[in-house]
A protein has these predicted regions:
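Short acidic/histidine-rich motifs immediately flanking catalytic phosphotransfer sites
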Residues: 66-70, 158, 427-429
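Nucleotide phosphate-binding/pyrophosphate-handling subdomain across enzymes
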Residues: 2-9, 19, 23-26, 30, ...
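C-terminal helical cap/extension that packs against the catalytic core
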Residues: 372-429
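NAD(P)-binding Rossmann-fold cofactor-contacting core
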Residues: 33-47
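Phosphate-binding loop of NTP-binding sites
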Residues: 3, 26-32, 49, 62-66, ...
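Conserved N-terminal Rossmann-fold NAD(P)-binding element of oxidoreductases
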Residues: 10-15, 434
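Beta-strand->loop->alpha-helix junctions that form or flank phosphate-binding loops
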Residues: 37-38, 56-59, 95-99, 140-141, ...
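Structural beta-sheet core signal
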Residues: 36, 139, 179, 217, ...
Length: 453
């Protein structure tokens, strides 16, 4: 922790990233002088600026602070970035986001949530249950909590709830007292190379659990027998072989009511207002953590009923008798499958139109068959051009690759502008927009096209 106390001034390269902005808010809350760079202004960077954090949007060495104690960068920043190169050449303390999380969590009780999907919702649910029940925690989230409109909060209690990101193996720097693993599906193969390497990293993550600690895993993970800790629970939506699972599910006006069952206890009539059957499973993971920590059942139930979700996770951008518009971060075949089946569990009579923006050329290429299979679950699909993020184009890897593998007939690749024209003309009753790129910037214009008819 001594490293942290020495920092009076800190600079973030890529401050607008979801994980980076949480760290920026953490240091700001400690009275540290925080500033940063990002390549574009977003609602999130504007929130940071409003809190007193100086941000510039040009890659210029003359704009960076020369008296900073530490420089934090994200893996999404290219190695040749002028500001990063400058700080390295001048021998400043230059660290990754994961190094800073390691410093923060060295002396705390840590609840670390990992998994190739589901982790943001589970992390946010756990942090919300702990905050709402009065247990208290410091939270570093990979999404914006709809309850608190932030991805970070602090507490006097020396407990940290943190999203453990497997990208570039950064989660292996954390030492959990409680670890949750939500999924181990192949992802980030640009880093790991093979699905087996992804699994190996998660097994290593489970081995980081402190002696006497607890490991909570989704039922049915591959190589589950290699995931071991002193206290261990599996969870599932409906697999009764799991240590904790749901039963007696009822859908009421887009909300879910269910019981949660363990061999030692049963929690009756849990009400969750967040859509998507996969979110019942995410909720069970969070409840399992809360029960392990000894939080009272009634406090857990009240907190779950008050959970408003995570921005861009099954988020209703518009919901009235004429139109439903759902915005979601899904960018992996399994997430898309869960999203579409979740929407259909609530709106089973309506035609589901999906607008999907693929994220990364490498992921599109590696998971093309899986994407096509999941996209085929929708009634009609519009695919936008691939969002490149940190990557250069790959030959033969375009949105048409997915289109050609799909079996349904109502499908097309459109530009963003063409998609807006299509929405204005067709006025779909049930529209889902999914992706991790910049598709979220289209949600408001699409909402207005639906509202103004």
């Amino acid at each position: 922790m001594s490293k942290l106390n020495e920092i009076k001034k800190i600079y973030f390269i890529g401050i607008g990233g979801i994980g980076m902005s949480a760290l920026a808010r953490y240091f700001k809350s400690r009275g540290v002088d925080v500033s940063g760079y990002d390549k574009t202004s977003t609602p999130l960077t504007r929130e940071l600026e409003a809190s007193g954090i100086a941000i510039h949007y040009e890659e210029r060495v003359d704009l960076v602070p020369k008296d900073t104690d530490a420089v934090v960068y994200t893996p999404a920043i290219p190695a040749q970035h002028a500001e990063l190169v400058y700080y390295r050449e001048q021998n400043y303390t230059v660290v990754k986001r994961s190094d800073v999380l390691q410093w923060i969590t060295e002396g705390s009780f840590n609840i670390c949530v990992g998994g190739t999907h589901g982790k943001t919702t589970v992390t946010t649910m756990i942090a919300h249950l702990l905050r709402h029940s009065g247990y208290g925690c410091n939270a570093f989230l990979g999404g914006i909590s709809a309850n608190y409109q932030t991805n970070f909060w602090s507490s006097e209690r020396n407990v940290v709830v943190v999203e453990a990101d497997e990208y570039d193996r950064s989660f292996l720097k954390l030492v959990p007292d409680v670890a949750v693993i939500t999924a181990m599906d192949p992802d980030h193969l640009d880093i790991y190379g093979t699905p087996e390497e992804v699994e190996k990293a998660f097994i290593e993550f489970s081995q980081k659990v402190k002696p006497g600690g607890c490991l909570i895993t989704k039922q049915g993970l591959s190589r589950a027998s290699e995931l071991k800790a002193e206290h261990q629970y599996s969870y599932s939506f409906e697999d009764t072989g799991a240590a904790v699972h749901a039963t007696n599910l009822k859908v009421q006006k887009g909300s879910y009511c269910f019981d949660v069952v363990n061999k030692d206890w049963i929690m009756k009539d849990v009400v969750l207002h967040m859509g998507g059957l996969h979110n019942i499973e995410n909720c069970i993971a969070a409840i399992t953590v809360a029960k392990y920590l000894g939080i009272e059942e009634e406090k857990i139930k009240v907190a779950v009923a008050d959970f408003k979700g995570v921005r861009r996770r099954f988020e209703y951008a518009l919901k009235n008798d004429q139109h439903v518009l759902i915005d979601d971060y899904a960018h992996h075949p399994e997430e898309l499958r869960a999203l579409i089946s979740g929407v259909k569990s609530i709106f089973n009579k309506d035609k589901l139109v999906l607008v999907f923006q693929p994220h990364l050329f490498s992921r599109t290429k590696d998971q093309a068959d899986g994407f096509a299979h999941s996209l085929d679950m929708a009634d009609e699909v519009i695919i936008l051009p691939i969002y490149p993020a940190r990557e250069l184009p790959m030959e033969g890897v375009t949105s048409e690759l997915l289109l050609n593998k799909m079996k349904i007939t109502n499908k097309q690749v459109l530009t963003k502008e063409e998609m807006k024209i299509w929405v204005a003309a067709h006025q779909p009753k049930l529209l889902v927009m999914a992706g991790a790129g910049d598709i979220d910037a289209l949600v408001q214009p699409v909402k207005e096209l639906l509202e103004n008819k």
